[in-house]
Amino acid sequence: LKGIEMEKGGMKTDVLEDVLKSSSGQKLIYVIPNFQNPTGDTMSAEKRKAVYELACKYDAVILEDNPYGKLRFAGEEVESIKSLDTQGRVLYSGTFSKILAPGLRVGYIAGPREIIQKIIVCKQVSDVHTNIWAQLLCYRFMTECDMEKHYAGLREIYRKKCSLMLDNMDKYFSAKVTYTKPEGGLFIWATLPDGSNMMDFCTKAVRDYKIAVVPGTAFMINES
């Protein structure tokens, strides 16, 4: 498992190419292109095209995970990597847990049949099948409710929450702290000044102010 450095608009494609070039065997590129967890950043159209071209060049498969795509409350939608796929090397996945209820652990995946068949076997080994009642709830919701109206309501809820959070960060945070301003999704990534101790910060936040902050090291391959 190799982490790829991030920058505004997505992963650094030159670093990705170096990793792909030096890797042998089967290669899988995992991306969350929209409102990525944990940065809240969205991969640009140019980055998506570059990642797909690198996958083609080095015979890699892309897993495009899009759990937050329907939660865009600002800006313009960016076409999926899957929409660029002419070689059958992109798997596209999503979930109902972010748009219906967190407890509904129901997801979906689209991709080449030969890969999907292998995924089905792995899924069956893992838990036989997804909870039938959860699947039925999702089915009934999709077929009997106005999904677009539901999405619009969710977007407004998260727009207000994000705006409130950013307004307070603008008001109370030091100018030395930088942070992302997402156009959707659930996440904001804050960067403390050089020399700060992240674990001390998180401990003090929860102990003194009852605010839980997830340290960035939790999302790093090398915990740097």
Where is each model-derived feature located?
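PLP-dependent class I/II
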Residues: L1-S224
